[in-house]
Amino acid sequence: MERKLTKIEIITRPSKLEDLKDALNKIGVHGMTVSQVYGAGLQRGHKEVYRGREYDVNLVPKITLETVVFEIPVEKVLEVAQKVLRTGKFGDGKIFVYELSDAVRIRTGHRGVEAIMDIPGEKAE
């Protein structure tokens, strides 16, 4: 049976990043990419005061954490992420799940699951 690659993209508050990384590491999710992003969702930004004037801030700072899993159940990742991130307030974020058709490790040419697996005996420099 061929193992399926699934990409999980989590967009949430920057203040939750360390808790999210720790929780994902505990369930075996170690490889991830994190980006600082700005977005507007249902909360549509907020107002800030600068030098006595009020300004609309339409884009709110967020982080995006992306990971690809094949052994760890997707539902487990979703459950853990929601548990860590949910405050019940606007701005908790979104999680997107994508099926991947392939992945390529550029250095070796490995494809599919082998492209994201740890290779025994190899160390990053």
Give the location of each predicted region.
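Positively charged, small/polar-rich N-terminal and surface patches that mediate targeting and assembly
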Residues: 1-125
